[in-house]
């Protein structure tokens, strides 16, 4: 009898709580969403693949929904129509950032163009990025560096083809991306598979990616900030400190060289010159922090996208053959591809779009935040709410995409859909004023790497695995990675 009383009391309390939550949601006019549990809210619904969990919930609650994740009110956008409302029509209202606690290490969020509020400092840094690093003229001027680094990747794969060893595609692409950026910025390689010191830098950047991608209790329960229960901020402080120390040394070295040997005219020189001529735009601290931004944002996204593209090629041999046939016809089998060739390779570009549709590198984009209450499609988004745009769900929306889960590059052959933030059905790089500033570089680099790998070798899965058996399971983190790294064996065409 006592147990029955306890059970009935608990059921009554739960019913009251559900009713209170429902009335509270109605009173506040929040978007629909699951009823939260006491204290944890809806955290239990996320699982280890929250992009999938929230996509599934959106089918029940709608393309705009609200959840309580711990202490944080979170609004989730899951359709192109709602994304356009948030990222274009009300872009300014949704332009602030929800800053992960890990980015409080070394106060990185106070210097980073990714996390700064849209204000004068942010505008100055965006101007520097757009004019001096990612402009068409600047990218044209250093095109030869990217070609050289991609050819070094091909040479690495050729060595493996001669020995019959498999290539860890993601790791090889990660190393190439690091060296590509380090040459653009510092005119030197910072990683080498045969150098312990270079390996240390590669591991440092990799560890930053790993820590940044871990779910952090503090992000859901800010009252735990001083405790840092998982030690994530502590480890990020160590990693950031070591990278910034390295960058500081490279800046000192360059300043000395400029006094005696003149300028190299790479990104670092351009930034130092800008700092001297317009110190109000950027200073030394911002230069070092911008370099950190570039490495963190530009390596994992590039390598994971290339790994997914190669995985889809190996999973779908007919698509790989079609891509290779186009390359052979337009470029010539085994010949070097230049960036200027990409526009003559429509099917390769479609492969890239389809890869980014199914496997957006950052599934929730970068979290946004509203500083004031905002109305969206009749619903209230309360002040301080975190806003997640589920680009993964939008790219797999069955009301927009025919056979949405199938890899079909052909769907883009007659389509005008673009990935530059104008078409909200496909926004792997975001949209609006917060769109990824590195987009112009990514649109050159990833197709060049993929086309070069496919035009230089035939590829098969390690151990004679059949294409249908290739595991395409995802691993959620700062980027959307393959749960099981792609290992493939190159052979001579």
Curated annotation (Swiss-Prot):
Cellular component GO terms, alphabetically?
endoplasmic reticulum membrane
Which residue stretches are annotated as topological domain Cytoplasmic? 24-493
The cross-references to InterPro entries, in alphabetical order and at most eight, read: Cyt_P450, Cyt_P450_CS, Cyt_P450_E_grp-I, Cyt_P450_sf
Q: Which reaction does it catalyse?
A: (2E)-geraniol + reduced [NADPH--hemoprotein reductase] + O2 = (6E)-8-hydroxygeraniol + oxidized [NADPH--hemoprotein reductase] + H2O + H(+)
This chain's protein is named Geraniol 8-hydroxylase
- Which domain of life, per UniProt? Eukaryota
Q: What cystine pairs are annotated? A: none
Q: Which PANTHER family match?
A: CYTOCHROME P450, FAMILY 76, SUBFAMILY C, POLYPEPTIDE 5-RELATED (PTHR47950), GERANIOL 8-HYDROXYLASE-LIKE (PTHR47950:SF4)
Among the GO molecular function terms of this UniProt record, one is: heme binding
Name the major location.
Answer: endoplasmic reticulum
Q: Which residues lie on this side of the membrane: Lumenal?
A: 1-6
The UniProt keyword set, sorted, is: Endoplasmic reticulum, Heme, Iron, Membrane, Metal-binding, Monooxygenase, NADP, Oxidoreductase, Transmembrane, Transmembrane helix
Free-text function comment from the UniProt entry: Hydroxylase involved in the biosynthesis of hydroxygeraniol, a precursor of the terpenoid indole alkaloids such as vinblastine and vincristine. Also able to hydroxylate in vitro nerol and to catalyze 3'-hydroxylation of the flavanone naringenin to form eriodictyol. No activity with apigenin, kaempferol, p-coumaric acid and ferulic acid as substrates.
The organism's taxonomic lineage, starting at the top: Eukaryota, Viridiplantae, Streptophyta, Embryophyta, Tracheophyta
Question: Subcellular location, in the record's words?
Answer: Endoplasmic reticulum membrane
Q: What induces it, per record?
A: Up-regulated by methyl jasmonate treatment.
The entry's heme-binding residues are 436
- Tissue and organ expression note: Expressed in roots, stems, leaves and flower buds. Hardly detected in mature flowers and fruits. Expressed in the internal phloem-associated parenchyma.
Q: Which family does it belong to?
A: Belongs to the cytochrome P450 family.
The transmembrane segments are: 7-23
Q: What is its EC number?
A: 1.14.14.83
**Note on file?**
The recommended numbering of geraniol gives (6E)-8-hydroxygeraniol as the product rather than 10-hydroxygeraniol as used in most publications.
Known Pfam families for this protein?
p450
List GO BP terms, alphabetically. monoterpenoid biosynthetic process
Q: How does it sit in the membrane?
A: Single-pass membrane protein
- The protein's required cofactors: heme
Q: What is the enzyme's main class?
A: oxidoreductase
